[in-house]
Amino acid sequence: MPEPARPAPAPVPVHGTLLAFDYGEKRIGVALGNSITRSARALEVIPNRSVEYRFTQITRLVNAWQPVGFVVGMPVHPEGEDQPMIKLAKRFGNQLHGRYGLPVTWVDERYSSIAAQDAGATDDVLDAEAARIILQQFFDESHA
C-alpha cells in the first residue's frame, strides 16, 4: 500500500497559537507557542498508549488552546537519510491534519532530544522539552 502523502507545508498564520509535537512510539512531547511572540514552552508529555488515548489527549489540548496549526518534528538522520521513525511521524502528522483540519508544518528534529538532554531536561519532561526546541527552531529559522 502506498504511503500517504505528506501534508503540504503551510505558512505560519499571522497570529495565533501553535502546538508542536515530538512524536515517539512510547511518548509524545508537546509544546505550545505563539506566532506573535515567537516563543515556545514545553507543555506536557502524552503517553502513546493507543491511537484512541493519544487523540483523546490531543483533542483536550486542541480544545483548551485553540491552535491555528501544528508543527511536527521529522526524525532525519544526521547525514540526511530517513530514520525508521520518519514513517510513523509522517502518519501522525497526517492524522493531525485529517482530524483537526489545521495546517501541519514539518521541522527537522534530528538533534532536539540531544539538545533537551544537554539543557538538563529530566526524563519526565524530556520529550516536551524536545517539542519546545522543535517549535522554537520553527520560529527562529524559517518564519521571520
UniProtKB/Swiss-Prot annotation:
Its EC number is 3.1.-.-. Its main location: cytoplasm. GO terms for biological process: rRNA 5'-end processing. One of its GO terms (molecular function) is nuclease activity. GO terms for cellular component: cytosol. Keywords: Cytoplasm, Hydrolase, Nuclease, Ribosome biogenesis. It holds the Pfam family RuvX. SMART domains: YqgFc (SM00732). It comes from the Bacteria. It is an enzyme of class 3 (hydrolase). It is found in: Cytoplasm. Belongs to the YqgF nuclease family. NCBIfam families: RNAse_H_YqgF (TIGR00250). Could be a nuclease involved in processing of the 5'-end of pre-16S rRNA. This is Putative pre-16S rRNA nuclease. It comes from Ralstonia nicotianae (strain ATCC BAA-1114 / GMI1000) (Ralstonia solanacearum).
